[in-house]
Amino acid sequence: MKKLSIILIGLFFCMSLQAQLRLTLGRVIEMAADSSLTAFRNQNMYLAGYWEYRTYQANRLPSLTLNLTPARYYRYITQRYDSGQDIDVYREQQMFSASGGLNISQNFDLTGGTFYIDTDLDYMRNFGSQTYTQYSSVPLRIGYQQNLLGYNPFRWERKIEPLKYEKVKKQYIYNTEQMSEEAVSYFFELALAQAELELAQENLISTDTLYKIGVQRQKIAAISQADLLTLRLDHVNAQNTLQNAEIAVKRAMFSLATFLNIDKDTDITLDLPGKPTNKTITVEEALAKAEENNPTYLEQEQNVLEAEQSLDRAKMEARFNASVNASVGFNQVADKLSEAYRHPLRQDLVQFTVSIPLVDWGVRRGRVNMAKNNLNVVRTSADQERQSVEKEIIVTVSDFNIQQRLIASAEEALDLAIQAHEQTRQRFIIGRADVNSLTLSLNRQQEAQKNYIQALRNYWQDYYKIRRLTLHDFESGFSLSDKFDYAVGMYR
């Protein structure tokens, strides 16, 4: 029984150790990039864009296609001409056939045409009063087809698809930095809650001690009954504040654990980052890096190109369309397979088609006008988005440079508030300070603690926001894309 108790105690101790986690801000950001659901979503969004670009590249390469019809059987009544009777008659016909072909094609971006090489073989066997077998072969055929005056999608894909993939890569890093911002928010939400809990615990002990001192002093008439009741009220309020602080910590801890995709019952303790080193970022430098890296600029450029593509398509479809298909090759037909490839005959094809819209009651012209108006809207929206990004950068950089001074000021205020409260507390104990002064000094200390943590929070949120908007690490001086590993979604 004793051994069992020891084992159970040991297991409980191990479980307690496993459920505890001490984290820094940097570690929280690393864990978010490694295991959070947001990171998983970001990676799959990138992979979707990656494979879309790979598909575009594959479409630019020669394609090899095998077309097969292994078996086809017909049995039906058909109308035929009987030369002996000089009349049309209905006859039953049975036929089995099979076919196969191999095709190689290559698209040309510049012209919008397709070059192809193919070979075909067909087999046919008729059943009935006259059974016969035939093979038809095309040993080789080389051809080219394209629209002469129509819309060329290949030319536009060549402009848009590489830009889309570059935007996808930048967007992946952008989303990762946005996730870092979320991590900062969750981190300091819990840090602030834990700091308030710690203050509430200290305040409860302090108010309890002061109330007991007040009871003793009231007995000798050193303080009034009203002051004693105020001390009692402070103690009761401290108990309520402690309970609310415990609830806030549990909520903040649960939110952080959920975001990091770890056990929701994990007991997380945070280490606040120290005072950051002074780093001034100029607005001009931030704007230059944003124009170079921010995916919003690439997205707007893509939107304009796609609108221009739609306008080009509408204009081309409003005109007459002409296409050409030309091929040269060989073919043969025979009763035996081997003879179907002997002495092939020349096969030539030149086909020119024209489609001219005569009357459409303004449909095509309407499509062109809609495409023009849409292009104007897209260009205006692009300018607005750029201005919005620039405004956000200017405001954030200005706030960031100010936050560094605010942290130093908040830290100094916290030190002074702690010293002032301790001195007021000691003066109250010896009867040289009243209850109002003591309460005021405690409130100032709590407010200074909140302001300091909030200053740290604002600084790091602005720091990672600038990283997100510019995709540049101003502390190390390198572009984030240079250090980003797209395979794992983390920095090398």
Where in the sequence are the language-model features?
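Amphipathic alpha-helical coiled-coil segments
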Residues: 41-56, 175, 179-200, 216, ...
